[in-house]
Amino acid sequence: MSRKVIAAGNWKMNKTPKEAVEFVQALKGRVADADTEVVVGVPFVCLPGVVEAAKGSNIKVAAQNMHWEEKGAFTGEVSGPMLAELGVDYVIIGHSERRQYFGETDETVNKKVHAAFKYGLKPIICVGESLTQREQGVTAELVRYQVKIALLGLSAEQVKEAVIAYEPIWAIGTGKTATNEQAEEVCGIIRECIKELYGQDVAEAIRIQYGGSVNAANAAELFNMPNIDGGLVGGASLKLDDFEKIAKYNK
């Protein structure tokens, strides 16, 4: 089965609403002929303008987080129905920065993934190990555990629609990239884990990204690996030229 490569930008806390709209308007024409699925993950306040700017193009829009409840006394949070009403396509769940700074756990990731599907959003589920964990040789064990908990209670059809992003924490924003072989190995472990849980068909269908200092220079080699179906791109997704090259890695 051929899986459509997904080039997703995670802007993190960057760009004002005006800057975001200008960026997407400029990006549209540049990636119109891309074979990849192009996604921009923008701050909450940028979502309305970016969804509008992306209309009629092949750019999909992602939120960077969501709450698992529909509504309620959760000051500062944003719910699935709010994102769905805006026309958001994807939501990034469990990014390492959310886990590190904001108390995200494997259990809250699972609740958010269920909420995403309930409200028609596709989750981009982030998993990955720290440098210490890699050095201790527990990468495979840890990532398998994160995947299993994140997907707990989901149907096979839901899992096929999900995206998993392997982001080694030691390679995020550090300039260190996992070697192609390291990235491929862990993405392969994730696919094998999905196969054990949901069978061969689901494992073949689900898209697994690599995230961790993906840039215009290394995207093609990474995306051509058998088990890597694109990237969750940080800093390089904030630069038009770089993100265009990543989205069109095969041209």
Swiss-Prot record:
Gene Ontology BP annotations: gluconeogenesis; glyceraldehyde-3-phosphate biosynthetic process; glycerol catabolic process; glycolytic process
UniProt key word Cytoplasm: yes
Assigned GO CC terms: cytosol
Main location: cytoplasm
Reactions catalysed, as given in the entry: D-glyceraldehyde 3-phosphate = dihydroxyacetone phosphate
Functional description taken from the UniProt entry: Involved in the gluconeogenesis. Catalyzes stereospecifically the conversion of dihydroxyacetone phosphate (DHAP) to D-glyceraldehyde-3-phosphate (G3P).
PANTHER family according to UniProt: TRIOSEPHOSPHATE ISOMERASE
Record-given protein name: Triosephosphate isomerase
